[in-house]
């Protein structure tokens, strides 16, 4: 039986028209397409008309043609190959359905000339209705590829409609990102300054200063920050949100049963609070059997294990109630199932339930790795992470949990697959819950700074992503993958990228002052990043005419906002 390492059975696509530069394709940046997950009776027609590859099979319900996954694993149809070019990004889309079975995973796989399989995206397909499958590939070398459908069911029969592969240069992709950023991260604000009789105040001057950005690019910290004043100064001058790498974890705070020690975590939290830095909790429990306190796996009695686990949840969540922005309640509970094996299938869901009762206002994450990174293994795919969150929220008493998805983002030292990453974020975002990238890093490699910038911009340009935390720091911090500064706190190339993005994603302090006129043009309108602002209105000729107020610019207020200021004079 032919398979690849993950055990999925493959079915090769017969490429009917290999280089047709027209046809229907899905725009990976379209807001209407990005979160589309419903199953439809007939695939909708897209306004996009340019695709490198375009074909359909089995569009009609009564057709006998479909992609059949042969039980013997043999490939029964030869293919003409598609030529891909290094430096381009290829976005794949197809509407798929099952002719037999229901709710099975269907994915797209690219096989390169050297026999490597690149997982390109996946969905849960259904019978008798169509689901949109999206993904793609960013080739690290030029060459030809074969395109496959994959399924976890060897008997699957897959119908495909409007299969498309669309090519973007990196410049075109970034232009799309920038256009989307203008829509999802900014709003245009128009100021109207009038007297009480509603006549305009000509010559008024409006000054604007951002006090808090809506989107936060943060950085993890560890205990070494308590030992280095330079590390503390470096951190506080840059970041407004953090998480602690190990200091809140169970194996750190209770190394011996019954002997809790929160000294390091408390001290780090105090530093953060003194410097206006928000803290994201990591982690209450960890479902990996190898990541427990050394004494926990020695407990054989399930009742005893339940007691110490509940004590841990109560202890850490009560201690930090109201002090954190979020919690990884059961870390990596798609990859691992230690507590489920020991305490029952609903262990994770019940722990989220208890956590919700202890701190109902904190955001609670399902936090996983290899979800957006496009690794070979397929344990915590976007579909499975989405299903885990749905399972937790469906547990009795959990419907009002403030849920969120944590995509860790431990990328390999190679060109990231941005097309796959965007499709993965689409799948996760279809839940309607916020997504955070929580542990972004990458081993040292040539072009690390380029790849990290591409990853962070991809996340920032996706509407479902609400924040990012990188696992990085200066040399003294011990972060040996993403090292942002040397021992003298001089930036590395990757450090320069982070500083550039911090400046770009926080409203510049050099916002031009607005001078009110009686014209009908947009001189009084300014494009502002979402966030909190202090606004001052004054007049150069009327010294007593001055007023200040706070303003929050939000996505919910729309693309254009009007702020009316009435002057008593």
From Swiss-Prot:
<keyword id="KW-0378">Hydrolase</keyword>
<dbReference type="GO" id="GO:0045493">
    <property type="term" value="P:xylan catabolic process"/>
</dbReference>
<feature type="active site" description="Nucleophile">
    <location>
        <position position="439"/>
    </location>
</feature>
<keyword id="KW-0325">Glycoprotein</keyword>
<dbReference type="Pfam" id="PF00331">
    <property type="entry name" value="Glyco_hydro_10"/>
</dbReference>
<feature type="glycosylation site" description="N-linked (GlcNAc...) asparagine">
    <location>
        <position position="197"/>
    </location>
</feature>
<feature type="signal peptide">
    <location>
        <begin position="1"/>
        <end position="25"/>
    </location>
</feature>
<dbReference type="InterPro" id="IPR001000">
    <property type="entry name" value="GH10_dom"/>
</dbReference>
<comment type="similarity">
    <text>Belongs to the glycosyl hydrolase 10 (cellulase F) family.</text>
</comment>
<dbReference type="InterPro" id="IPR044846">
    <property type="entry name" value="GH10"/>
</dbReference>
<feature type="glycosylation site" description="N-linked (GlcNAc...) asparagine">
    <location>
        <position position="544"/>
    </location>
</feature>
<feature type="domain" description="GH10">
    <location>
        <begin position="209"/>
        <end position="500"/>
    </location>
</feature>
<feature type="glycosylation site" description="N-linked (GlcNAc...) asparagine">
    <location>
        <position position="536"/>
    </location>
</feature>
<feature type="active site" description="Proton donor">
    <location>
        <position position="332"/>
    </location>
</feature>
<feature type="glycosylation site" description="N-linked (GlcNAc...) asparagine">
    <location>
        <position position="346"/>
    </location>
</feature>
<dbReference type="GO" id="GO:0031176">
    <property type="term" value="F:endo-1,4-beta-xylanase activity"/>
</dbReference>
<feature type="glycosylation site" description="N-linked (GlcNAc...) asparagine">
    <location>
        <position position="307"/>
    </location>
</feature>
<protein>
    <recommendedName>
        <fullName>Endo-1,4-beta-xylanase 5</fullName>
        <ecNumber>3.2.1.8</ecNumber>
    </recommendedName>
</protein>
<keyword id="KW-0858">Xylan degradation</keyword>
<keyword id="KW-0732">Signal</keyword>
<comment type="pathway">
    <text>Glycan degradation; xylan degradation.</text>
</comment>
<comment type="function">
    <text>Binds to and hydrolyzes insoluble and soluble xylan substrates.</text>
</comment>
<keyword id="KW-0624">Polysaccharide degradation</keyword>
<dbReference type="InterPro" id="IPR017853">
    <property type="entry name" value="Glycoside_hydrolase_SF"/>
</dbReference>
<feature type="glycosylation site" description="N-linked (GlcNAc...) asparagine">
    <location>
        <position position="261"/>
    </location>
</feature>
<keyword id="KW-0119">Carbohydrate metabolism</keyword>
<feature type="glycosylation site" description="N-linked (GlcNAc...) asparagine">
    <location>
        <position position="490"/>
    </location>
</feature>
<keyword id="KW-0326">Glycosidase</keyword>
């Amino acid at each position: 039986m032919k398979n690849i390492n993950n055990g999925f059975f493959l079915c090769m696509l017969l490429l009917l028209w290999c280089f047709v530069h027209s046809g229907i394709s899905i725009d990976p940046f379209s807001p209407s397409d990005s979160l589309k997950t419903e199953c439809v009776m007939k695939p909708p027609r897209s306004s996009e008309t340019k695709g490198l590859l375009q074909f359909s099979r089995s569009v009609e319900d009564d057709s006998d043609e479909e992609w059949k996954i042969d039980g013997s694993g043999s490939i029964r149809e030869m293919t003409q190959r598609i030529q891909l070019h290094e430096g381009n990004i290829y976005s794949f889309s197809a509407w798929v359905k099952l002719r037999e079975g229901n709710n099975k995973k269907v994915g797209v796989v690219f096989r390169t000339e050297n026999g490597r399989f690149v997982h390109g995206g996946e969905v849960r397909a259904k019978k008798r209705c169509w689901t949109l499958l999206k993904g793609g590939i960013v080739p690290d070398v030029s060459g030809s590829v074969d395109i496959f459908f994959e399924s976890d069911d060897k008997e699957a029969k897959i119908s495909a409609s409007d299969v498309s592969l669309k090519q973007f240069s990196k410049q075109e992709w970034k232009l799309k990102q920038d256009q989307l950023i203008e829509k999802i991260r900014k709003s245009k604000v128009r100021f109207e300054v009038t007297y009480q009789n509603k006549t305009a105040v000509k010559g008024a001057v409006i000054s604007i200063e951002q006090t808090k950005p809506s989107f936060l690019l943060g950085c993890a910290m560890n205990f070494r920050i308590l030992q280095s004043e330079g590390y503390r100064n470096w951190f506080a001058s840059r970041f407004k949100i953090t998480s602690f790498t190990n200091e809140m974890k169970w194996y750190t705070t209770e190394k011996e049963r019954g002997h809790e020690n929160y000294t390091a975590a408390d001290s780090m939290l105090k530093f953060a609070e003194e410097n206006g830095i928000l803290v994201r909790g990591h982690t209450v429990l960890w479902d990996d059997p190898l990541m427990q306190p050394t004494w926990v796996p020695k407990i054989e009695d399930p009742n005893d294990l339940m007691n110490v686990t509940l004590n841990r949840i109560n202890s850490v969540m009560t201690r930090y109630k109201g002090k954190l922005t979020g919690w990884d309640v059961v870390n990596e509970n798609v990859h691992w199932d230690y507590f489920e094996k020991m305490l029952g299938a609903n262990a994770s869901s019940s722990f989220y339930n208890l956590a919700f009762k202890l701190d109902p206002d904190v955001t609670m994450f399902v936090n996983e790795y290899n979800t957006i990174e496009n690794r070979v293994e397929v344990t915590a795919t976007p579909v499975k992470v989405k299903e885990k969150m749905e399972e937790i929220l469906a547990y009795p008493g959990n419907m009002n949990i403030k849920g969120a998805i944590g995509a860790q983002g431990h990328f390999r030292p190679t060109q990231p697959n941005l097309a796959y990453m965007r499709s993965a974020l689409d799948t996760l975002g279809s839940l309607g819950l916020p997504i955070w990238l929580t542990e972004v890093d990458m081993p040292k490699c040539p072009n690390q700074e380029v790849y990290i910038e591409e990853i962070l911009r991809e996340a920032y340009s996706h509407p479902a992503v609400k924040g990012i935390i990188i696992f990085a720091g200066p040399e003294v911090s011990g972060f040996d993958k993403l090292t942002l500064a040397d021992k003298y706190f001089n930036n590395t190339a990757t450090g320069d990228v982070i500083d550039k993005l911090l400046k770009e994603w926080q409203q510049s302090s050099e916002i031009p002052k607005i001078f009110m006129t009686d014209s009908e043009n947009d001189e009084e309108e300014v494009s502002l990043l979402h966030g909190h602002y202090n606004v001052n209105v004054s007049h150069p000729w009327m010294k007593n005419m001055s007023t200040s107020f706070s303003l929050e610019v939000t996505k919910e207020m729309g693309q254009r906002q009007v702020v009316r200021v009435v002057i008593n004079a």
